[in-house]
From Swiss-Prot:
The lineage of its organism: Bacteria, Pseudomonadati, Pseudomonadota, Gammaproteobacteria, Enterobacterales. Missing up to 1200 C-terminal residues compared to orthologs. The gene coding for this protein is interrupted by a hybrid IS2D/IS30C element between amino acids 839 and 840. Residues 30-50, 91-145, 307-354, 407-449, 506-531 are annotated as: Disordered. This is Exported protein YdbA. Keywords: Secreted, Signal. The full-length protein (which is about 2000 amino acids long) is part of the autotransporter family. It is found in: Secreted. It comes from Escherichia coli (strain K12). Residues 307-319, 506-516 have a biased composition (Low complexity). Residues 1-21 form the signal peptide. Residues 339-348, 517-526 have a biased composition (Polar residues). GO terms for cellular component: extracellular region.
Length: 852
């Protein structure tokens, strides 16, 4: 039988200041012999020398081991308050429960004996007469949240209350109100600090738990569960609120968790760990961590609000196949601060709550391959070096379904690795220099932008560095301000698909690709306005731009720029270009290819296509209208092939040019219809009446021009009252085809038509008063030592009240040869009157020329 209970001895020791109570009982053996185990051990064996430690009794070895354990060497840290129950037992079916009992302090037994301190020699001290009524002992409170109440026979650890029972082997059994059990094997009292350290096991003996002088709980063994219902505060380096060493460990943090000074709130080492953090979590200071798990297949559920500042880390998981579910709002501020961190492959973070990152912090960091982030909340990132989501590893997938706002140099999503995918379904707003919405560094990166993208202030919406990148932009994209870029890719074989509406203004750039073999497919509506604004830009060889949507360019902007050799631009949509300096499509590089089967409208000093290339190919098969002071196509270079198969190339503006070709050895084939007819109803028609507009200009040497289509020129004559020795009025100057230079060849196989008009201006009084005489309008003008071969049909019709200089003019040694199949038809000429000078009798005009 037990002559003294462990509980009584512990209480006696606690009252007397004894440092350690471990198996302090007198046990009667089977032979009736009493075993005296009343051994006095040093309170702090850590201060003893190695020789002194060797001389200690064997009963003190648990104390020595206990003092050497890491969980007892943490120093004087702040106390943990209000942790709930630690479940250290299994049920009858050996199913692990989700709630639990906790490590306790020595409890009382059923005895009515008053605890009596042992004598130095092991003799007993006889208690007082039992007739005396003893005074009930007061509860003993320790500074690390442990209370021993002998009267109520309870042990309270943190906020968990247990009843206790002594066992025959000297251990103490604990049981909470739900019937869950645990066992205490050892305990130690620190008299100076009034704290108690406890050590025990689960009911089945499989799990070891320790509650140290700092109020820190350490679980060693599999299938352990800790329920922390109260607020937990951890402060100081190496301080830990709850620690589990073993597989399938679980911590349920219902109370708030506050960690600072380099401490750890929850530490679990082992596979398949789970933390349900339902309270508010606050972590601050370098090396501080709210939750740390080292092991595979970990799951952390942060349901409450988390605030991470000044270099702290909210959740860190080191292991493969980890999952972090952040349902609450996460706020991260300060350099080196991190909300959620996973180091391992197949990591996953589900961010249902909002994510707010500033001051250089990181919201989510994953290092490892095949990571996934589902960000369903609103993400706000601001300040340089701040990153909302960062993944370092291959095959990463980031899904941003909520709205993202990135400002002042921050980055929303950054992925460093190959084969990455970012799906941005929500709206993304990026503002400020060095701000980036989504950034990928690696090959085969892909961004699917289903949501709207709004970029300003020099920010970048999407940045990809690496080969074979793809961006599918299906939402609305708005980019404004200098240096702002909606989509930028640095690498070869890039593909960008702009399917939604894009608006680029004030010096911004919609899409920019720097690399070879790039392709940009623009099937949506694109509007570009303002000097230095660019819709799509490729800098690299073999770049391709396909325009299937509509493109509107104004204010000096450029719709498309393709800079590099062997570049291609194919337009099947509508292009509208207006204002000084505006260019619809600019291509510069050797061997360029341009094709247009869409409709192009150019006006107000703009240029539709600006092409600088040698050995290039230009094919215009759609329709084109050229307005005031504008040029439809401006081609500069040698050995180029130009095919004008346009169903309608109309030059209707003042001082306008349909096609301008400058260079040597170019080939121009006109198979479509070309009309030059200045708009006489325009407000500025009279002002620019004498400034010629031209259908096609060819400047240079050894060029070959062939007309197989139809070329029509309309010329107006403004007539006034006849006066002696003065012209009857004035006629405008317009030309269909002008070829200037030596060695050029012009083959006129198609039809030429010159149509005259009379008094087409709304008010031609100012023009007619100048009395310039007959028109110098000609369908064909060739100047220089070149040859013209006329084989087609030529028609003259309409009104020519002042006469005209000729349908074809060849000058400066130009040669005209009229083939046997050529015809000339004069029809529908209502008037051919002239006064004051003699006009030509034939509708051909030669100046220093030869005709055969």
């Amino acid at each position: 039988m037990q002559r003294k209970t462990l509980l009584s001895a512990c209480i006696a020791l606690a009252l007397s200041g004894q440092g350690w109570a471990a198996d302090i009982t007198e046990v009667e053996t089977t032979t009736g012999e009493k075993k005296n185990t009343n051994v006095t051990c040093p309170a702090d064996p850590g201060k003893l020398s190695p020789e002194e430690l060797k001389r200690l009794p064997s009963e003190c070895s648990p104390l020595v081991e206990q003092n050497l354990m890491p969980w007892l060497s943490t120093g004087a840290a702040a106390l943990i308050t209000a942790l709930a129950v630690v479940e250290l037992n299994d049920d009858d079916d050996h199913h692990h429960r989700n709630n639990s009992p906790l490590p306790p302090t020595p409890p009382d037994d059923e005895s009515d004996d008053t605890p009596v301190p042992p004598t130095p020699g092991g003799d007993e001290i006889i208690p007082d007469d039992p007739d005396d009524t003893p005074t009930p002992p007061k509860p003993v409170s320790f500074n690390n949240d442990v209370i021993l109440d002998k009267t109520e026979k309870t042990l309270t650890i943190r906020d968990s209350v247990f009843t206790y029972t002594e066992n025959a082997d000297g251990t103490i059994s604990l049981q909470d109100s739900n019937g869950r059990k645990a066992t205490i094997n050892l305990w130690q009292i620190d008299e100076a600090n009034n704290t108690v350290a406890l050590e025990g096991v689960s009911a089945d003996g499989a799990t070891k738990w320790q509650y140290n002088h700092n109020g820190e709980l350490v679980i060693t063994g599999d299938n352990a569960t800790v329920n922390n219902n109260g607020k937990t505060t951890v402060d100081g380096k190496d301080s830990t609120g709850t620690e589990i060493n073993g597989n399938n460990g679980k911590v349920i943090q219902d109370g708030d968790l506050d960690v600072s000074g380099g401490g750890h709130g929850i530490d679990i080492t082992g596979d398949s760990a789970t933390v349900d953090n339902k309270g508010t979590m606050t972590v601050t200071d370098p090396e501080s961590m709210g939750i740390q798990i080292d092991g595979d297949k970990a799951i952390v559920n942060n349901e409450g609000e988390s605030t991470i500042t000044n270099g702290g880390t909210g959740t860190q998981i080191n292991g493969d196949d980890a999952t972090a579910n952040n349902n609450g709002k996460t706020t991260v501020d300060g350099k080196d601060s991190t909300g959620t961190e996973i180091n391992g492959n197949n990591g996953k973070v589900i961010q249902d709550g909002d994510l707010d990152v500033s001051g250089g912090g990181h919201g989510i960091d994953i290092t490892g391959d095949s990571a996934t982030v589902d960000n369903k909340g609103t993400m706000t990132v601001t300040d340089p070096e701040s990153i909302g989501i960062q993944v370092d590893g291959d095959q990463a997938v980031v899904n941003n379904e909520g709205e993202s706002a990135i400002t002042n140099g921050g980055t929303g999503t950054q992925i460093n690795g190959d084969d990455a995918t970012a799906n941005n379904n929500g709206k993304t707003t990026v503002d400020g220099k060095d701000s980036t919405g989504t950034e990928i560094a690696g090959n085969n990166g892909k961004v699917i932008q289903d949501g709207d993208l709004d970029v300003s202030g020099g920010g970048h919406g999407i940045d990809i560095t690496g080969d074979s990148a793809t961006v599918d932009n299906k939402g609305t994209m708005t980019v404004t301000d200098p240096e702002s870029i909606g989509i930028q890719i640095d690498g070869d074989q890039a593909i960008v698909n702009n399917e939604g509406e894009s608006t680029i203004t004030n010096g911004g750039t919609g899409t920019q690709i720097n690399g070879n073999d790039a392709t940009a497919n623009n099937s949506g509506k694109t509007t570009v306005d303002g000097k230095d604004s660019t819709g799509t830009k490729i800098a690299g060889n073999i770049g391709i731009v396909n325009l299937d949507g509509s493109l509107t360019v104004t204010g000096g902007a450029h719709g498309v720029e393709n800079i590099g050799d062997n570049g291609t631009v194919n337009n099947k949509g509508d292009i509208v270009v207006s204002d000084t300096g505006s260019i619809g499509v600019l291509i510069n590089g050797e061997g360029a290819t341009v094709s247009n089967t869409g409709d192009v409208n150019v006006s107000n000093e703009a240029t539709g296509f600006s092409i600088t290339t040698n050995s290039g190919k230009v094919s215009l098969a759609g329709s084109m209208q050229v307005g005031d002071f504008s040029t439809g196509v401006d081609l500069n270079g040698n050995n180029n092939s130009v095919t004008l198969a346009a169903k309608d190339l109309k030059v209707v503006g003042q001082k306008a040019t349909g096609i301008n070709v400058s260079g040597d050895a170019n080939t121009v084939n006109i198979t479509g219809n070309v009309l030059v007819d200045k708009d006489k109803t325009a407000d500025n028609a009279a002002e620019y009446f004498f400034d010629p507009s031209v259908g096609i200009n060819v400047y240079g040497s050894d060029n070959n021009v062939t007309l197989d289509g139809k070329l029509t020129v309309v010329s107006d004559s403004e007539v006034t009252s006849r006066q002696s020795n003065l012209f009857d009025g004035s006629a405008e100057k317009t030309s269909g085809l002008v070829v200037i230079g030596d060695g050029n060849t012009v083959n006129m196989n198609g039809g030429l038509e010159l149509i005259g008009e009379k008094n087409a201006l709304a008010d031609g009084s100012q023009v007619t008063s100048l009395r310039t005489g007959y028109s110098y309008t000609s369908v064909i003008v060739v100047s220089g030592e070149s040859s013209v071969y006329l084989n087609g049909d030529t028609t003259i019709s309409g009104e020519f009240p002042l006469g005209f200089a000729g349908v074809i003019r060849v000058q400066d040694k130009a040669l005209l040869e009229i083939g046997s199949g050529a015809t000339l038809t004069m029809q529908d000429i209502d008037s051919f009157e002239h006064h004051g000078t003699r006009t030509l009798d034939l509708p051909l005009y030669f100046q220093t020329s030869v005709i055969t």
